[in-house]
Amino acid sequence: MTVRIAINGFGRIGRNVVRALYESGRRAEITVVAINELADAAGMAHLLKYDTSHGRFAWEVRHEREQLFVGDDVIRILHERTLADLPWRELGVDVVLDCTGVYGNREHGEAHIAAGAKKVLFSHPGSNDLDATVVFGVNQNQLRAEHRIVSNASCTTNCIIPVIKLLDDAYGIESGTVTTIHSAMNDQQVIDAYHSDLRRTRAASQSIIPVDTKLAAGITRIFPQFNDRFEAIAVRVPTINVTAIDLSVTVKKTVKASEVNQLLQKAAQGAFHGIVDYTESPLVSIDFNHDPHSAIVDGTQTRVSGAHLIKTLVWCDNEWGFANRMLDTTLAMAAVGFRLDASASTKL
């Protein structure tokens, strides 16, 4: 069965989802039938074709009126502001990928369902009343047909959760701290300008800027046993893509850095292949641009202090890796089937 998807919001993640779909050769599994975006069709086509981070799209892209052509495929373009008025029923949409970054609670998800979609996947952390939050590679096997409104968590949650799971399963994590070193985002300023967050009033290209993060909450959403045992901070740096995460955990068992690296490398080659990668090459952030993994462990930076404190550095392409996980989770949601008569009876 080919899953019919619609994309709501054609920004960084929405466009990368389309690019990843075509570049990964999954068009036999997923078809994009519509994109809802307030911008005009000419701008949508141009930004899909030309991308500063990811280069020129290999597929032919053009638009005619309210249709976007990617190769021989035709995608309907919509400019609807009201979710309930979207024509998902008419278009036979199976899953809406809501990539706006604006919507994320159950009411928003139910609006997509009322418009005719069978399921909804948010490209960002959602409210607690959603049916499930999925980090693909860790908990997607717990999805059920009744999970209709789902969050794909965040790019940083997808990056760090697999590594936390591996370390916890092997050594038993007592507590941890996380520092996210994140590329600049579109909620920052090109030059100094007003923003409700005074730090984000400053030019993104000229400073390392501390910002708030809910990553600790994202960790406990997936692993409730770590409630009040993880803290996180984040800074934005003057690059346009790729993120590094500094993870420090205190563990119950004694361990050596070489053992940690052996564990993570084995996982990258085995159970977490395609989700986690491992490198000991002397690489920098640009080298991970367009990498489809959720997490790339930099084994050269692993440290152990006092036999119980582990520090690791984990990279991710916060756009491309996450866009690929959106596709993975979409297929996982479709694989368990569609239950149309009721909302979820059990939460994940």
UniProtKB/Swiss-Prot annotation:
<feature type="active site" description="Nucleophile">
    <location>
        <position position="155"/>
    </location>
</feature>
<dbReference type="InterPro" id="IPR020828">
    <property type="entry name" value="GlycerAld_3-P_DH_NAD(P)-bd"/>
</dbReference>
<dbReference type="GO" id="GO:0042823">
    <property type="term" value="P:pyridoxal phosphate biosynthetic process"/>
</dbReference>
<dbReference type="Pfam" id="PF02800">
    <property type="entry name" value="Gp_dh_C"/>
</dbReference>
<dbReference type="GO" id="GO:0048001">
    <property type="term" value="F:erythrose-4-phosphate dehydrogenase activity"/>
</dbReference>
<feature type="binding site">
    <location>
        <position position="318"/>
    </location>
    <ligand>
        <name>NAD(+)</name>
    </ligand>
</feature>
<dbReference type="InterPro" id="IPR020831">
    <property type="entry name" value="GlycerAld/Erythrose_P_DH"/>
</dbReference>
<dbReference type="GO" id="GO:0008615">
    <property type="term" value="P:pyridoxine biosynthetic process"/>
</dbReference>
<dbReference type="InterPro" id="IPR020829">
    <property type="entry name" value="GlycerAld_3-P_DH_cat"/>
</dbReference>
<dbReference type="GO" id="GO:0005737">
    <property type="term" value="C:cytoplasm"/>
</dbReference>
<feature type="binding site">
    <location>
        <position position="200"/>
    </location>
    <ligand>
        <name>substrate</name>
    </ligand>
</feature>
<comment type="function">
    <text>Catalyzes the NAD-dependent conversion of D-erythrose 4-phosphate to 4-phosphoerythronate.</text>
</comment>
<comment type="pathway">
    <text>Cofactor biosynthesis; pyridoxine 5'-phosphate biosynthesis; pyridoxine 5'-phosphate from D-erythrose 4-phosphate: step 1/5.</text>
</comment>
<keyword id="KW-0520">NAD</keyword>
<dbReference type="Pfam" id="PF00044">
    <property type="entry name" value="Gp_dh_N"/>
</dbReference>
<feature type="binding site">
    <location>
        <begin position="154"/>
        <end position="156"/>
    </location>
    <ligand>
        <name>substrate</name>
    </ligand>
</feature>
<keyword id="KW-0963">Cytoplasm</keyword>
<dbReference type="GO" id="GO:0006006">
    <property type="term" value="P:glucose metabolic process"/>
</dbReference>
<feature type="binding site">
    <location>
        <position position="236"/>
    </location>
    <ligand>
        <name>substrate</name>
    </ligand>
</feature>
<dbReference type="InterPro" id="IPR036291">
    <property type="entry name" value="NAD(P)-bd_dom_sf"/>
</dbReference>
<dbReference type="InterPro" id="IPR006424">
    <property type="entry name" value="Glyceraldehyde-3-P_DH_1"/>
</dbReference>
<dbReference type="GO" id="GO:0050661">
    <property type="term" value="F:NADP binding"/>
</dbReference>
<feature type="site" description="Activates thiol group during catalysis">
    <location>
        <position position="182"/>
    </location>
</feature>
<feature type="binding site">
    <location>
        <position position="81"/>
    </location>
    <ligand>
        <name>NAD(+)</name>
    </ligand>
</feature>
<dbReference type="InterPro" id="IPR006422">
    <property type="entry name" value="E4P_DH_bac"/>
</dbReference>
<feature type="binding site">
    <location>
        <begin position="12"/>
        <end position="13"/>
    </location>
    <ligand>
        <name>NAD(+)</name>
    </ligand>
</feature>
<dbReference type="InterPro" id="IPR020830">
    <property type="entry name" value="GlycerAld_3-P_DH_AS"/>
</dbReference>
<keyword id="KW-0560">Oxidoreductase</keyword>
<keyword id="KW-0664">Pyridoxine biosynthesis</keyword>
<comment type="subunit">
    <text>Homotetramer.</text>
</comment>
<comment type="similarity">
    <text>Belongs to the glyceraldehyde-3-phosphate dehydrogenase family. Epd subfamily.</text>
</comment>
<dbReference type="GO" id="GO:0051287">
    <property type="term" value="F:NAD binding"/>
</dbReference>
<feature type="binding site">
    <location>
        <begin position="213"/>
        <end position="214"/>
    </location>
    <ligand>
        <name>substrate</name>
    </ligand>
</feature>
<protein>
    <recommendedName>
        <fullName>D-erythrose-4-phosphate dehydrogenase</fullName>
        <ecNumber>1.2.1.72</ecNumber>
    </recommendedName>
</protein>
